[in-house]
A protein has these predicted regions:
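Short, structured motif recognition centered on aromatic/hydrophobic residues
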Residues: 53-55, 99-107, 117-133, 152-156, ...
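N-terminal BTB/POZ boundary and linker segment
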Residues: 1-62, 66, 97, 101, ...
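A cross-kingdom feature marking solvent-exposed beta-strand/loop segments within repeated
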Residues: 68-72, 76, 111-122, 138-154, ...
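A low-complexity, Ser/Thr/Gly/Pro-enriched, surface-exposed linker/loop concept
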Residues: 72, 76-85, 251-257
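A short alpha-helix capping/helix-loop junction motif
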Residues: 147, 170-171
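Amphipathic alpha-helical protein-protein interaction segments
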Residues: 53, 60, 91-95, 141-148, ...
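Eukaryotic helix-linker segments that join adjacent hydrophobic helices
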Residues: 80-84, 93-100
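Acidic, serine/threonine- and proline-rich low-complexity regulatory tracts
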Residues: 2-7, 11, 180-357
């Protein structure tokens, strides 16, 4: 249930704005109470940029050890009189928009142990219900990458900074829907009917966001996406791009992806081998695999994770097709396992462990 809220305009008149009510509050004359998070029963006022938030100290402290410690640390003597409507004022050096996103996530928590709709009672033959929804439910399941990054950016940054584990994990889970950390996740994403084609700027934004907030699991596949871009785009110097060190590693990784495609995932085309149970001597002379390899090799960028599906073009027996599928599957699995190493990153497990420290 939402906490009662008052719009600033409904709490004080224009002539009696508490922001400028006393001498000690003159510094807040340019600050504005937030319309959604100036709660009449709030116990602490947080000053973030030019905005004031009157919220519940215990709620924030229960979500974050950092907030708990912050609120219990005595203020310097010169700050002792910084009060507003009986509430202590605490300054936070954060972004106003990021903090609004964080408060939305905290004040609209997920009720994980309850159904979306909880039946409360029956009155006059009508069911009275409450609906429990998380702030994260407000983003569509098929939202594009840019929308997801904008949605999680502030929450991820502040939940990492203030050690709010469950919100950080929700952001990471959303992040991984766009940059999977498992081959199954990649296969599910790649096979979707509404598969999204990422813009290069958004992928670079994702890498920067991941690095800033220690979300290391997303890096291997994000680097994979950058490595497949045209050289001209990678070498462009744009303000919000990834570092030149990361760009250099993506260019090196691009060459390694070519090797992985040739030697691992699609080796069944370049180095065709008959199935052990093959009964047709014609398969040994089939030209289909080599022809398919030349088509693949002419592609502009390597894509060793791509699932090959033109099996009829091989013109070999069913046993040989099954054997090729097995080699292809094992090759893709090996590419995925090696993906971090192709970009000079630690192993998948090491990335996860470092991310969760």
């Amino acid at each position: 249930m939402k906490s009662p809220r008052n719009s600033p305009d409904s709490s004080f008149s224009k002539d009696e704005n508490p922001i400028i009510a006393g001498p000690s509050l003159k510094m807040y004359s340019q600050s504005t109470p937030h319309p959604d998070f100036w709660l009449y029963d709030g116990s602490i006022v947080l000053s973030v940029e030019s905005c004031l938030f009157r919220v519940h100290q215990t709620i924030l402290a229960n979500h974050s050890e950092i907030f708990s410690d912050l609120f219990t640390v005595p203020q310097p003597a010169e700050d002792a009189e910084e009060m507003m409507e009986g509430c202590r004022i605490v300054h936070l050096p954060d972004s106003e928009s990021d903090f609004v996103d964080l408060l939305n996530a905290i004040y609209h928590p997920e009720c994980a142990l309850l159904p979306l709709t909880l039946v409360v009672w029956l009155v006059s033959n009508h069911l009275i219900t409450f609906h429990f929804a998380s702030y994260f439910d407000s983003i569509s399941a098929d939202a594009d990458l840019e929308t997801v990054l904008t949605f999680i950016q502030g929450i991820l940054h502040l939940s990492t900074k203030y050690i709010i584990h469950y919100l950080r994990q929700r952001c990471i889970s959303l992040f991984l829907t766009k940059f999977p950390s498992t081959l199954d996740g990649y296969t599910l994403k790649a096979g979707a009917s509404n598969r999204e084609k990422y813009k290069s700027d958004n992928v670079m934004r994702a890498i920067n966001l991941a690095r800033q907030n220690n979300v290391l699991e997303v890096l291997p596949y994000a680097f994979y996406c950058i490595a497949r871009l045209p050289h001209k785009r990678i070498l462009k110097d744009r303000t919000m791009d990834i570092s030149w060190k990361d760009k250099a590693m993506c260019l090196v990784g691009r060459e390694r992806l070519k090797w992985a495609q040739t030697s691992l995932s699609h080796v069944f085309l370049l180095n065709f081998q008959r199935a052990p149970l093959c009964q047709s001597s014609l398969c040994a002379f089939a030209r289909g695999p080599h022809s398919e390899w030349h088509v693949l090799d002419c592609m502009k960028s390597p894509n060793p994770l791509h699932a090959y599906d033109n099996w009829d073009n091989l013109n070999v027996c069913a046993d040989c097709v099954a054997y090729c599928k097995l080699r292809h599957m094992k090759g893709r699995e090996e590419v995925w396992d090696r993906l971090p190493d192709l970009f000079e990153l630690p192993t998948w497990n090491e990335l996860r462990n470092a991310q969760n420290m």
